[in-house]
């Protein structure tokens, strides 16, 4: 099972919107993890100005995104992995 990470931050209203979108999508084929951007220096250095960010393997989807972009991102990455 592939790990899908949502990078978030405390009091991030866009992150809350992203989480609501993800709750509308079937993520049964993924191990979903909500990760604070401050938990790893690499996340903070790379994505501090882009959150929310979805990470799957070595691919990323940065905000803004909607339900259709998320589904496309997941399908594309499943086919390529």
Where are these regions (language model features)?
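Local sequence-structure signature of Cys/Sec-based thiol-disulfide redox active-site neighborhoods
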Residues: 1-24
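Small/polar loops that bind or transfer phosphate-bearing groups
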Residues: 7, 35, 58, 62
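Generic recognition of short, well-ordered alpha-helical segments
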Residues: 17-20, 45-46, 65
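Conserved helix-turn-beta segment immediately C-terminal to the redox Cys motif
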Residues: 19-37
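Non-catalytic, surface beta->alpha helical segment in thiol-disulfide oxidoreductase systems
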Residues: 56-81
